[in-house]
Amino acid sequence: MSSNPFIGLRNWIRGAQQWYLTTPKRALQEAYEAALKIRAIELEHFDGQPISPLNLPVGEVSSYFETELKQLLKTIRMRMMEFRASRQILPLAPFQSPPTPVNEGINGATETYTVTATVSSTTAEPSVYEKLRVIDATLNRYKRQREKELDALARPSLSRQDPQQRQQAAALDKIAEDSLYLSEYISDDLTSDSKLDSSSFIPRSILRTADRFRRELNSDEATEAEVVRDFRTSKLRTRLAVRFMLLLVILPLLTQQISKALIVSPLVNHFKAVGQIERIINSQLEDNILDELARFENKIRFESLVSNVPIAPEEIQNRIREKAIELSTEYQKELIEPLKNILSDALGFTVFLALVFTGQRQLAIVKTFLDEVVYGLSDSAKAFMIILFTDVFVGFHSPHGWEVLVNNTLEHFGFPRNEDFINMFIATFPVMLDTVFKYWIFRYLNQISPSAVATYKNMNE
Protein backbone atom coordinates (compact mmCIF):
# COMPACT_ATOMS: atom_id res chain seq x y z
CA MET A 1 0.00 0.00 0.00
CA SER A 2 2.89 2.33 0.69
CA SER A 3 4.02 2.12 -2.91
CA ASN A 4 0.75 3.43 -4.35
CA PRO A 5 1.83 7.08 -4.36
CA PHE A 6 5.00 6.19 -6.23
CA ILE A 7 3.05 4.10 -8.72
CA GLY A 8 0.65 6.98 -9.29
CA LEU A 9 3.53 9.40 -9.75
CA ARG A 10 5.23 7.00 -12.15
CA ASN A 11 2.01 6.63 -14.17
CA TRP A 12 1.59 10.39 -14.25
CA ILE A 13 5.16 10.90 -15.48
CA ARG A 14 4.68 8.17 -18.06
CA GLY A 15 1.46 9.79 -19.27
CA ALA A 16 3.12 13.21 -19.45
CA GLN A 17 6.01 11.70 -21.40
CA GLN A 18 3.60 10.00 -23.78
CA TRP A 19 1.67 13.25 -24.24
CA TYR A 20 4.92 15.10 -24.96
CA LEU A 21 6.17 12.53 -27.45
CA THR A 22 2.88 12.56 -29.36
CA THR A 23 2.81 16.36 -29.70
CA PRO A 24 3.51 16.43 -33.47
CA LYS A 25 0.88 13.81 -34.20
CA ARG A 26 -1.69 15.44 -31.92
CA ALA A 27 -1.12 18.93 -33.34
CA LEU A 28 -1.37 17.66 -36.91
CA GLN A 29 -4.55 15.74 -36.12
CA GLU A 30 -6.22 18.78 -34.54
CA ALA A 31 -5.33 20.95 -37.54
CA TYR A 32 -6.61 18.26 -39.90
CA GLU A 33 -9.91 17.97 -38.02
CA ALA A 34 -10.37 21.76 -38.12
CA ALA A 35 -9.81 21.70 -41.90
CA LEU A 36 -12.41 18.94 -42.26
CA LYS A 37 -14.89 20.96 -40.19
CA ILE A 38 -14.43 23.91 -42.53
CA ARG A 39 -14.99 21.65 -45.52
CA ALA A 40 -18.12 20.18 -43.91
CA ILE A 41 -19.56 23.67 -43.37
CA GLU A 42 -18.82 24.54 -46.99
CA LEU A 43 -20.56 21.42 -48.31
CA GLU A 44 -23.56 21.73 -46.00
CA HIS A 45 -24.30 25.45 -46.13
CA PHE A 46 -22.40 26.99 -49.07
CA ASP A 47 -22.67 24.40 -51.88
CA GLY A 48 -18.96 23.63 -51.61
CA GLN A 49 -17.89 27.26 -52.02
CA PRO A 50 -15.60 29.09 -49.55
CA ILE A 51 -17.20 30.81 -46.59
CA SER A 52 -17.28 34.52 -47.41
CA PRO A 53 -18.94 37.44 -45.61
CA LEU A 54 -20.00 38.74 -49.03
CA ASN A 55 -22.13 35.62 -49.54
CA LEU A 56 -23.63 35.49 -46.05
CA PRO A 57 -27.03 36.91 -45.09
CA VAL A 58 -27.02 39.94 -42.84
CA GLY A 59 -27.61 39.18 -39.16
CA GLU A 60 -26.71 36.53 -36.63
CA VAL A 61 -26.10 33.89 -39.31
CA SER A 62 -23.30 35.95 -40.82
CA SER A 63 -21.77 36.63 -37.41
CA TYR A 64 -21.92 32.94 -36.47
CA PHE A 65 -20.22 31.61 -39.61
CA GLU A 66 -17.59 34.37 -39.61
CA THR A 67 -16.70 33.62 -35.99
CA GLU A 68 -16.65 29.88 -36.63
CA LEU A 69 -14.38 30.29 -39.66
CA LYS A 70 -11.96 32.57 -37.80
CA GLN A 71 -11.72 30.13 -34.88
CA LEU A 72 -11.12 27.13 -37.13
CA LEU A 73 -8.48 28.91 -39.22
CA LYS A 74 -6.80 30.12 -36.05
CA THR A 75 -6.79 26.55 -34.73
CA ILE A 76 -5.17 25.33 -37.95
CA ARG A 77 -2.44 27.97 -37.87
CA MET A 78 -1.67 27.52 -34.17
CA ARG A 79 -1.57 23.73 -34.39
CA MET A 80 0.64 23.86 -37.47
CA MET A 81 3.05 26.18 -35.65
CA GLU A 82 3.10 23.66 -32.81
CA PHE A 83 3.62 20.84 -35.31
CA ARG A 84 6.57 22.54 -37.02
CA ALA A 85 8.21 23.48 -33.72
CA SER A 86 7.84 20.02 -32.17
CA ARG A 87 9.02 18.29 -35.36
CA GLN A 88 12.47 19.83 -34.84
CA ILE A 89 13.11 17.68 -31.75
CA LEU A 90 10.51 14.90 -31.77
CA PRO A 91 10.10 12.03 -34.25
CA LEU A 92 7.04 11.39 -36.37
CA ALA A 93 5.83 8.46 -38.40
CA PRO A 94 7.46 8.46 -41.86
CA PHE A 95 5.54 9.80 -44.83
CA GLN A 96 3.57 7.34 -46.82
CA SER A 97 3.71 7.43 -50.58
CA PRO A 98 1.58 10.31 -51.82
CA PRO A 99 -1.73 9.39 -53.46
CA THR A 100 -2.12 10.02 -57.16
CA PRO A 101 -3.85 13.34 -57.76
CA VAL A 102 -7.21 13.25 -59.46
CA ASN A 103 -6.32 15.99 -61.93
CA GLU A 104 -3.30 18.05 -62.76
CA GLY A 105 -3.18 21.69 -63.74
CA ILE A 106 -4.84 24.76 -62.41
CA ASN A 107 -8.26 23.37 -61.57
CA GLY A 108 -6.80 20.02 -60.56
CA ALA A 109 -5.65 21.34 -57.20
CA THR A 110 -9.18 22.31 -56.25
CA GLU A 111 -10.59 18.95 -57.37
CA THR A 112 -7.86 17.04 -55.56
CA TYR A 113 -8.62 19.09 -52.48
CA THR A 114 -12.31 18.21 -52.66
CA VAL A 115 -11.75 14.51 -53.20
CA THR A 116 -9.09 14.31 -50.51
CA ALA A 117 -11.21 16.14 -47.98
CA THR A 118 -14.23 13.93 -48.54
CA VAL A 119 -12.46 10.62 -48.94
CA SER A 120 -10.01 11.12 -46.09
CA SER A 121 -12.86 11.70 -43.68
CA THR A 122 -14.17 8.21 -44.38
CA THR A 123 -10.88 6.31 -44.15
CA ALA A 124 -9.61 4.97 -40.84
CA GLU A 125 -6.26 6.76 -40.64
CA PRO A 126 -5.13 9.08 -43.45
CA SER A 127 -1.43 9.39 -44.04
CA VAL A 128 0.58 12.37 -42.90
CA TYR A 129 0.89 13.46 -46.52
CA GLU A 130 -2.89 13.46 -46.98
CA LYS A 131 -3.45 15.46 -43.80
CA LEU A 132 -0.86 18.05 -44.78
CA ARG A 133 -2.32 18.31 -48.27
CA VAL A 134 -5.83 18.95 -46.91
CA ILE A 135 -4.51 21.54 -44.46
CA ASP A 136 -2.43 23.35 -47.10
CA ALA A 137 -5.33 23.33 -49.54
CA THR A 138 -7.63 24.86 -46.91
CA LEU A 139 -5.18 27.61 -45.96
CA ASN A 140 -4.35 28.43 -49.58
CA ARG A 141 -7.99 28.48 -50.55
CA TYR A 142 -8.91 31.04 -47.89
CA LYS A 143 -5.80 33.05 -48.58
CA ARG A 144 -6.93 33.42 -52.21
CA GLN A 145 -10.49 34.05 -51.04
CA ARG A 146 -9.25 36.83 -48.76
CA GLU A 147 -7.34 38.44 -51.64
CA LYS A 148 -10.42 38.19 -53.82
CA GLU A 149 -12.57 39.88 -51.16
CA LEU A 150 -10.07 42.71 -50.71
CA ASP A 151 -9.95 43.26 -54.47
CA ALA A 152 -13.74 43.39 -54.55
CA LEU A 153 -13.85 45.87 -51.68
CA ALA A 154 -11.34 48.13 -53.45
CA ARG A 155 -13.74 48.66 -56.36
CA PRO A 156 -16.34 51.45 -56.36
CA SER A 157 -19.95 50.73 -55.48
CA LEU A 158 -22.52 50.03 -58.17
CA SER A 159 -23.87 53.57 -57.93
CA ARG A 160 -20.47 54.95 -58.99
CA GLN A 161 -19.78 52.43 -61.75
CA ASP A 162 -20.72 52.86 -65.36
CA PRO A 163 -21.58 49.81 -67.53
CA GLN A 164 -18.00 49.54 -68.83
CA GLN A 165 -16.59 49.43 -65.32
CA ARG A 166 -19.15 46.83 -64.28
CA GLN A 167 -18.21 44.61 -67.21
CA GLN A 168 -14.54 44.82 -66.29
CA ALA A 169 -15.36 44.05 -62.65
CA ALA A 170 -17.34 41.00 -63.75
CA ALA A 171 -14.39 39.90 -65.87
CA LEU A 172 -12.11 40.18 -62.86
CA ASP A 173 -14.52 38.11 -60.75
CA LYS A 174 -14.63 35.44 -63.44
CA ILE A 175 -10.84 35.31 -63.63
CA ALA A 176 -10.56 35.14 -59.84
CA GLU A 177 -13.00 32.24 -59.64
CA ASP A 178 -11.33 30.22 -62.41
CA SER A 179 -7.70 30.82 -61.48
CA LEU A 180 -5.75 28.99 -58.83
CA TYR A 181 -3.22 31.77 -58.29
CA LEU A 182 -5.02 35.10 -58.40
CA SER A 183 -2.00 37.33 -58.91
CA GLU A 184 -0.87 35.46 -62.02
CA TYR A 185 -4.09 36.04 -63.91
CA ILE A 186 -5.14 39.59 -63.05
CA SER A 187 -3.66 42.00 -65.55
CA ASP A 188 -2.61 45.48 -64.62
CA ASP A 189 -4.53 46.72 -67.64
CA LEU A 190 -7.78 45.51 -66.12
CA THR A 191 -7.17 47.00 -62.68
CA SER A 192 -5.71 50.30 -63.78
CA ASP A 193 -7.78 53.30 -62.85
CA SER A 194 -6.55 55.16 -65.89
CA LYS A 195 -8.43 52.71 -68.11
CA LEU A 196 -11.62 53.42 -66.25
CA ASP A 197 -11.17 57.16 -66.42
CA SER A 198 -10.94 57.35 -70.20
CA SER A 199 -13.00 60.10 -71.73
CA SER A 200 -16.19 59.38 -73.66
CA PHE A 201 -18.52 61.33 -75.91
CA ILE A 202 -21.38 60.79 -73.45
CA PRO A 203 -20.68 61.86 -69.84
CA ARG A 204 -20.29 58.91 -67.54
CA SER A 205 -22.71 60.41 -65.02
CA ILE A 206 -25.49 60.04 -67.61
CA LEU A 207 -24.45 56.46 -68.29
CA ARG A 208 -24.45 55.68 -64.57
CA THR A 209 -27.89 57.26 -64.11
CA ALA A 210 -29.33 55.35 -67.06
CA ASP A 211 -27.81 52.11 -65.82
CA ARG A 212 -29.24 52.72 -62.34
CA PHE A 213 -32.72 53.23 -63.81
CA ARG A 214 -32.32 50.03 -65.81
CA ARG A 215 -31.37 48.06 -62.71
CA GLU A 216 -34.21 49.54 -60.65
CA LEU A 217 -36.80 48.73 -63.33
CA ASN A 218 -35.43 45.25 -63.90
CA SER A 219 -37.31 42.61 -61.89
CA ASP A 220 -34.67 39.94 -62.37
CA GLU A 221 -33.64 38.14 -59.18
CA ALA A 222 -30.01 38.40 -60.22
CA THR A 223 -30.28 42.19 -60.17
CA GLU A 224 -31.71 42.15 -56.65
CA ALA A 225 -28.96 39.79 -55.54
CA GLU A 226 -26.41 42.14 -57.08
CA VAL A 227 -27.82 45.09 -55.11
CA VAL A 228 -27.78 43.10 -51.87
CA ARG A 229 -24.23 42.00 -52.55
CA ASP A 230 -23.23 45.61 -53.21
CA PHE A 231 -24.73 46.63 -49.85
CA ARG A 232 -22.80 43.89 -48.05
CA THR A 233 -19.63 44.91 -49.85
CA SER A 234 -20.11 48.55 -48.85
CA LYS A 235 -20.75 47.56 -45.24
CA LEU A 236 -17.67 45.36 -45.08
CA ARG A 237 -15.58 48.02 -46.87
CA THR A 238 -16.56 50.64 -44.30
CA ARG A 239 -15.68 48.36 -41.41
CA LEU A 240 -12.28 47.38 -42.82
CA ALA A 241 -11.40 50.94 -43.87
CA VAL A 242 -12.24 52.45 -40.48
CA ARG A 243 -10.37 49.70 -38.66
CA PHE A 244 -7.25 50.12 -40.82
CA MET A 245 -7.29 53.92 -40.46
CA LEU A 246 -7.53 53.55 -36.68
CA LEU A 247 -4.61 51.12 -36.78
CA LEU A 248 -2.55 53.62 -38.80
CA VAL A 249 -3.12 56.24 -36.10
CA ILE A 250 -3.30 54.31 -32.83
CA LEU A 251 -0.61 51.67 -33.32
CA PRO A 252 2.28 54.09 -34.15
CA LEU A 253 1.25 56.39 -31.29
CA LEU A 254 1.13 53.50 -28.83
CA THR A 255 4.50 52.28 -30.08
CA GLN A 256 5.98 55.74 -29.65
CA GLN A 257 4.67 56.21 -26.11
CA ILE A 258 5.36 52.69 -24.84
CA SER A 259 8.82 52.44 -26.37
CA LYS A 260 9.75 55.84 -24.96
CA ALA A 261 8.65 54.90 -21.43
CA LEU A 262 9.91 51.31 -21.29
CA ILE A 263 12.86 51.08 -23.70
CA VAL A 264 14.26 54.41 -24.85
CA SER A 265 14.17 56.37 -21.57
CA PRO A 266 15.94 53.74 -19.40
CA LEU A 267 18.53 53.25 -22.14
CA VAL A 268 19.28 56.94 -22.70
CA ASN A 269 19.34 57.72 -18.97
CA HIS A 270 22.40 55.48 -18.60
CA PHE A 271 24.37 57.63 -21.04
CA LYS A 272 24.60 61.09 -19.53
CA ALA A 273 27.18 62.15 -22.09
CA VAL A 274 24.52 62.44 -24.79
CA GLY A 275 23.36 65.65 -23.14
CA GLN A 276 26.59 67.36 -24.12
CA ILE A 277 25.57 67.18 -27.78
CA GLU A 278 22.26 68.89 -27.08
CA ARG A 279 24.05 71.55 -24.99
CA ILE A 280 26.13 72.43 -28.06
CA ILE A 281 23.21 72.32 -30.51
CA ASN A 282 20.66 74.22 -28.44
CA SER A 283 22.16 76.87 -26.20
CA GLN A 284 18.72 78.37 -25.62
CA LEU A 285 18.02 75.73 -22.97
CA GLU A 286 20.81 77.09 -20.79
CA ASP A 287 19.65 80.66 -21.38
CA ASN A 288 16.12 79.71 -20.34
CA ILE A 289 17.38 78.10 -17.12
CA LEU A 290 19.49 81.15 -16.24
CA ASP A 291 16.60 83.52 -16.98
CA GLU A 292 14.28 81.52 -14.76
CA LEU A 293 16.85 81.47 -11.93
CA ALA A 294 17.31 85.24 -12.26
CA ARG A 295 13.55 85.82 -12.10
CA PHE A 296 13.34 83.64 -9.00
CA GLU A 297 16.17 85.57 -7.31
CA ASN A 298 14.56 88.92 -8.14
CA LYS A 299 11.24 87.66 -6.83
CA ILE A 300 12.81 86.59 -3.50
CA ARG A 301 14.59 89.91 -3.08
CA PHE A 302 11.43 91.85 -3.94
CA GLU A 303 9.45 89.92 -1.33
CA SER A 304 12.18 90.63 1.21
CA LEU A 305 12.08 94.36 0.47
CA VAL A 306 8.29 94.76 0.72
CA SER A 307 7.92 92.46 3.73
CA ASN A 308 7.62 93.87 7.25
CA VAL A 309 10.20 91.32 8.38
CA PRO A 310 13.06 91.21 5.84
CA ILE A 311 14.41 87.82 4.89
CA ALA A 312 17.90 87.11 6.11
CA PRO A 313 20.61 87.01 3.42
CA GLU A 314 21.50 83.45 4.42
CA GLU A 315 17.87 82.37 3.88
CA ILE A 316 17.83 84.05 0.48
CA GLN A 317 20.99 82.24 -0.53
CA ASN A 318 19.61 78.89 0.64
CA ARG A 319 16.41 79.36 -1.38
CA ILE A 320 18.38 80.37 -4.45
CA ARG A 321 20.66 77.35 -4.04
CA GLU A 322 17.68 74.96 -3.75
CA LYS A 323 16.10 76.50 -6.84
CA ALA A 324 19.39 76.21 -8.73
CA ILE A 325 19.64 72.50 -7.86
CA GLU A 326 16.05 71.96 -9.00
CA LEU A 327 16.64 73.80 -12.27
CA SER A 328 19.87 71.88 -12.83
CA THR A 329 17.98 68.58 -12.57
CA GLU A 330 15.37 69.81 -15.03
CA TYR A 331 18.13 71.05 -17.31
CA GLN A 332 19.76 67.61 -17.42
CA LYS A 333 16.41 66.04 -18.29
CA GLU A 334 15.76 68.56 -21.06
CA LEU A 335 19.18 67.88 -22.55
CA ILE A 336 18.43 64.18 -23.16
CA GLU A 337 14.71 64.57 -23.92
CA PRO A 338 15.22 65.33 -27.67
CA LEU A 339 17.18 62.11 -28.17
CA LYS A 340 14.37 60.15 -26.52
CA ASN A 341 11.86 61.82 -28.83
CA ILE A 342 13.93 61.05 -31.93
CA LEU A 343 14.37 57.36 -31.09
CA SER A 344 10.77 56.77 -30.02
CA ASP A 345 9.42 58.67 -33.04
CA ALA A 346 11.64 56.57 -35.30
CA LEU A 347 10.15 53.38 -33.83
CA GLY A 348 6.62 54.70 -34.26
CA PHE A 349 7.35 55.76 -37.84
CA THR A 350 8.81 52.32 -38.55
CA VAL A 351 5.58 50.70 -37.38
CA PHE A 352 3.61 53.09 -39.59
CA LEU A 353 5.71 52.21 -42.64
CA ALA A 354 5.35 48.51 -41.87
CA LEU A 355 1.56 48.88 -41.79
CA VAL A 356 1.61 50.79 -45.09
CA PHE A 357 3.87 48.33 -46.94
CA THR A 358 2.11 45.23 -45.63
CA GLY A 359 -1.38 46.64 -46.11
CA GLN A 360 -1.42 47.66 -49.76
CA ARG A 361 -4.80 46.02 -50.32
CA GLN A 362 -6.19 47.68 -47.19
CA LEU A 363 -4.93 51.03 -48.47
CA ALA A 364 -6.81 50.46 -51.72
CA ILE A 365 -9.96 49.80 -49.67
CA VAL A 366 -9.38 53.00 -47.67
CA LYS A 367 -8.97 54.97 -50.91
CA THR A 368 -12.23 53.58 -52.27
CA PHE A 369 -13.99 54.32 -48.97
CA LEU A 370 -12.76 57.92 -48.94
CA ASP A 371 -13.79 58.34 -52.57
CA GLU A 372 -17.27 57.12 -51.67
CA VAL A 373 -17.47 59.60 -48.79
CA VAL A 374 -15.98 62.64 -50.53
CA TYR A 375 -17.63 62.25 -53.91
CA GLY A 376 -20.91 61.33 -52.24
CA LEU A 377 -21.19 64.78 -50.67
CA SER A 378 -23.37 67.43 -52.21
CA ASP A 379 -21.82 70.20 -54.29
CA SER A 380 -22.30 72.75 -51.49
CA ALA A 381 -20.70 70.42 -48.96
CA LYS A 382 -17.73 69.82 -51.25
CA ALA A 383 -17.24 73.55 -51.79
CA PHE A 384 -17.54 74.21 -48.04
CA MET A 385 -14.95 71.54 -47.19
CA ILE A 386 -12.52 72.89 -49.81
CA ILE A 387 -12.85 76.48 -48.57
CA LEU A 388 -12.47 75.40 -44.94
CA PHE A 389 -9.42 73.29 -45.72
CA THR A 390 -7.70 75.93 -47.84
CA ASP A 391 -8.40 78.79 -45.42
CA VAL A 392 -7.01 76.81 -42.48
CA PHE A 393 -3.79 75.73 -44.19
CA VAL A 394 -3.12 78.41 -46.84
CA GLY A 395 -5.45 81.23 -45.84
CA PHE A 396 -4.71 84.72 -44.56
CA HIS A 397 -4.33 83.67 -40.91
CA SER A 398 -2.53 80.38 -41.60
CA PRO A 399 1.05 81.76 -41.07
CA HIS A 400 0.39 82.06 -37.32
CA GLY A 401 -0.61 78.41 -37.12
CA TRP A 402 2.36 77.31 -39.21
CA GLU A 403 4.69 79.32 -36.97
CA VAL A 404 3.42 77.56 -33.84
CA LEU A 405 3.62 74.17 -35.55
CA VAL A 406 7.20 74.65 -36.80
CA ASN A 407 8.36 76.07 -33.47
CA ASN A 408 6.92 73.12 -31.52
CA THR A 409 8.49 70.68 -33.98
CA LEU A 410 11.93 72.26 -33.57
CA GLU A 411 11.54 72.19 -29.80
CA HIS A 412 10.41 68.55 -29.89
CA PHE A 413 13.59 67.48 -31.68
CA GLY A 414 15.89 69.72 -29.64
CA PHE A 415 16.68 72.41 -32.21
CA PRO A 416 16.84 76.09 -31.26
CA ARG A 417 14.25 78.53 -32.53
CA ASN A 418 15.40 79.91 -35.87
CA GLU A 419 13.40 82.86 -37.15
CA ASP A 420 14.99 82.73 -40.61
CA PHE A 421 14.06 79.08 -41.08
CA ILE A 422 10.51 79.64 -39.81
CA ASN A 423 9.95 82.62 -42.11
CA MET A 424 11.38 80.73 -45.09
CA PHE A 425 9.16 77.73 -44.39
CA ILE A 426 6.03 79.86 -44.05
CA ALA A 427 6.87 81.70 -47.27
CA THR A 428 7.29 78.52 -49.36
CA PHE A 429 5.37 75.52 -48.03
CA PRO A 430 1.83 77.03 -47.89
CA VAL A 431 2.36 78.35 -51.42
CA MET A 432 3.24 74.87 -52.69
CA LEU A 433 0.26 73.44 -50.81
CA ASP A 434 -2.04 76.01 -52.39
CA THR A 435 -0.68 75.04 -55.82
CA VAL A 436 -1.48 71.39 -55.14
CA PHE A 437 -5.04 72.31 -54.13
CA LYS A 438 -5.59 74.32 -57.29
CA TYR A 439 -4.14 71.57 -59.48
CA TRP A 440 -6.40 68.98 -57.83
CA ILE A 441 -9.45 71.19 -58.38
CA PHE A 442 -8.51 71.81 -62.01
CA ARG A 443 -7.37 68.27 -62.86
CA TYR A 444 -9.77 66.00 -60.99
CA LEU A 445 -12.67 67.81 -59.35
CA ASN A 446 -13.42 69.80 -62.50
CA GLN A 447 -13.94 66.52 -64.39
CA ILE A 448 -15.80 64.62 -61.69
CA SER A 449 -18.05 67.38 -60.35
CA PRO A 450 -18.04 70.62 -62.41
CA SER A 451 -21.01 71.96 -60.45
CA ALA A 452 -18.99 71.67 -57.22
CA VAL A 453 -16.22 73.74 -58.79
CA ALA A 454 -18.74 76.38 -59.87
CA THR A 455 -20.22 76.44 -56.37
CA TYR A 456 -16.72 76.76 -54.90
CA LYS A 457 -15.91 79.74 -57.14
CA ASN A 458 -19.18 81.48 -56.24
CA MET A 459 -18.68 80.91 -52.51
CA ASN A 460 -15.04 81.99 -52.70
CA GLU A 461 -15.93 85.22 -54.45
Curated annotation (Swiss-Prot):
InterPro entries, per database record: CemA
Q: Does the keyword S-adenosyl-L-methionine apply?
A: no
Has UniProt tagged this entry with the keyword Transmembrane?
yes
Transmembrane regions listed in the UniProt entry: 244-264, 339-359, 386-406, 421-441
| Database matches in Pfam families | CemA (PF03040)
Q: Which GO terms describe its cellular component?
A: plasma membrane
Q: Which UniProt keywords apply?
A: Cell inner membrane, Cell membrane, Hydrogen ion transport, Ion transport, Membrane, Transmembrane, Transmembrane helix, Transport
Q: Which GO terms describe its molecular function?
A: proton transmembrane transporter activity
Which family is it part of? Belongs to the CemA family.
Q: What does this protein do?
A: Required for H(+) efflux immediately after light irradiation to form a rapid H(+) concentration gradient across the thylakoid membranes. Together with PxcL, contributes to transient H(+) uptake following dark to light transition.
UniProt name for this protein: Proton extrusion protein PxcA
Organism (species)? Thermosynechococcus vestitus (strain NIES-2133 / IAM M-273 / BP-1)
* Gene name for this UniProt entry: pxcA
